[in-house]
Amino acid sequence: MKASGFTPWPQEMAQKYRDAGFWTQQTIPEMLEASAQRYSECVALAAGEQQWTYQTLVEQVDKLAAGFQHKLNLKSGDKAVLHLPNVGEFYLSFFALLKIGVQPVLALPAHRYSEIRYFCHFTEAKVLITAPQLGVKTAEIAQQVAADLPSLKTLVWAGEESLMPTGAQALNTLFLEEVGAQSDVAEDFAFFQLSGGTTGTPKLIPRTHSDYLYSVSASNDVCQFSARTRYLCILPAAHNFPLSSPGALGCFMAGGMVVLAPDASPQTAFSLIEKHQITVAALVPPLALLWLDEAARTQQNIASLQVLQVGGARFSEEAAKRVKPELGCTLQQVFGMAEGLVNYTRLDDPESEIVTTQGRPMSPADEFLVLDEAGNPVPKGTAGILFVRGPYTIQGYYHAPEHNQRSFTELGYYRTGDIVVMTEAGNLQVVGRDKDQINRGGEKIAAEEVENHLLAHDSVHDAAVIAIPDEYLGERSCAALVCRAKNPKAIEIKRFLRGRGLADFKIPDRVIFVDVLPKTPVGKINKNKLLELI
């Protein structure tokens, strides 16, 4: 079933990817079923005290797919928002929805009312699947969204029934013996991921079975995942990095074992590494720094760890050099985006490349350009904006013609917004962004979105949100406010933003008050000048 609002690859390009074997006819649930045939009694997934073998996982997915279909009356083409922490129910729901052709929106645990309501409204989702999160009123968020949106027919609760929102249905009551129908074909639009974006409107990224499975397969080839791989999922399971680079799907494809971490603390992670003999883990730079600090004092044995992937933001050379001597494993830098392109340092790259670059594209079919502002190619060693197209890089955002016009060229190249330098060896060094976006430890914050919320405050006349350098997170956010009369307290501003349902990571780390915001000659806020003043 071809979805409206989805931009397909041009036929000539799509045929090239089929002929090369990059795109196959396998769907994501069929990939899991194929692994279950080969590794039926092997443990596929561990979460807390629960474990699923490949056979059990497939059986549970089938039963849940039947429940979604027959109890909730979901059908192919419907949308569902998944707002789940790192629990086994995330993968059960993800595979089950795909199996019957329902297209999940993979919301992140950090998203709150504002974002969840938007995802449900924009996609006309029929169901919201959520669960308890420590310190988050997920039940209240779900009830409020459901009250706002008549199109949202069902709330599904994947947690203790005593905490369940009124009117919700418990996920554990949905498992049926009936067989759910298969989704359509591999090149159909399968699910949504989310772009950090630079505007106040989150952009939805449509992925197909074919392009996503190729991304996973190519990642496995580079990262050498196998049935012996034991992957620790610390980052949010819904995020592209731990889902497909190679992530959990790569582990399932190879017949390995995925272990879910209930929180991101290094103490929890090190305990799980020792317990399950973890071989691979993926982190963002701030977590990697915490691991390096914890390694000096831990009593846990983490000698099984062979590879530590670090991505999501620039990892400093100084920190990168510490990984091998202090953690005893190989560092693999990862630079990618939910829109597609993934770069890896190779496991056998020289140490000098591993610690100073963010890798190179993983596929021979990745076509990339490094251009100046005028659109001219720049030589190696010179910074430019990265453009890319290929068999797993999307051709457009979902129902977003204005964004697509700005973000994609006529030839189908995606303008990443990343400023990079290509080394003589062909690796990329990420040196910045050309978009008004803050990268707070791997979490992308659109300055415009936060500014729009700030301008809704009665006291705020003008607002600018900028990135300020931070040794730990890479960047932190700072809001500079011009107020109408008496300046409110910074804590009041933060409380106001939380009250509007903004995710915690988007709340400015610092709030300052100024008499006037510096402007460019054409009247726009001069954020470079503002940063100098701060």
Task: Annotate each predicted stretch with a short phrase.
Residues V58-A66, I205-S226, I234, A288-L292:
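Conserved structural elements of the adenylate-forming
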Residues P361-A365, N376-S407, I445:
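Conserved ATP/PPi-binding loop(s) of AMP-dependent carboxylate-activating enzymes
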Residues H111-Y118, L128-Q133, G390, Q395-G396, ...:
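AMP-binding/adenylate-forming catalytic core of the ANL superfamily
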Residues T53-Q55, A190-Y214:
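Conserved AMP-binding A3 loop
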Residues G101, L213-R230, N240-V280, E294:
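Conserved AMP-binding/adenylation subdomain of ANL enzymes
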Residues V102-A170, R484-K486:
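Structural core segment of the AMP-binding/adenylate-forming
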Residues F22-Q25, P29, E33, E41-K75, ...:
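Conserved AMP-binding/adenylate-forming core of the ANL superfamily
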Residues I278-A282, E294-E353, E367:
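Gly/Ser/Thr-rich phosphate-binding loop
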